């Protein structure tokens, strides 16, 4: 209830007065959405201790149907595929610590992420749409060399890489400038925030 009230208060009055959501199919009909973006991330796998990362990425969302799961409202469904790169600056190399070696030090890390999601879109007003994206992501992390010491105070090699798979979920919204270009913002896991521009030819 509180969340709904906050969202309602923050949503533009013009959008709240619009009844676009009540008209199934009344939205831009495109085959694919291409969305380059900037992103803010966190260390999502337990081998890396923490901190905030910055990077760039892109999504390609392939439309499956312009009439979504609920036939009485204006919604659509797509499959989203992505590639993101994130860089983290030198916090402690906790992946050694988590593996029982007691390693502390300062190294940087680079992550590549490959999200695969179902994108469920809701067209709530003439210029506004929102979406949810459940799915999974494949990640690969590469950790640079650094001055790391184990629990005994002995210098050890902090260079390391690993690959894994994890659950993913995002919520987001778009402001549609027209039928082919929109500003897109996304919040969720594993990325905290993405901001990009969607092209829908």
PLM-predicted stretches and their roles:
Residues 1-10:
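Bacterial N-terminal signal peptides
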Residues 14-66, 188-190, 194, 198-201:
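Short glycine/proline- and aromatic-enriched beta-strand/turn motifs that initiate or cap beta-hairpins
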Residues 16-31, 65-77, 123-130, 177-180:
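Short loop/turn motifs that connect adjacent beta-strands in outer-membrane beta-barrel proteins
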Residues 19-20, 27-30, 82-85, 155-201:
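Predominantly the C-terminal beta-signal and adjacent terminal strand-loop region
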Residues 30-32, 50-56, 75, 108-114, ...:
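Residues that define the transmembrane beta-barrel architecture of outer-membrane proteins
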Residues 36-40, 56-62, 83, 114-120, ...:
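Residues on the lipid-exposed face of transmembrane beta-strands in outer-membrane beta-barrel proteins
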Residues 39-47, 65-67, 84-92, 138-145, ...:
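Sequence/structural signature of outer-membrane beta-barrel proteins
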Residues 47, 85-109, 140-163:
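Flexible, solvent-exposed loop segments that connect beta-strands
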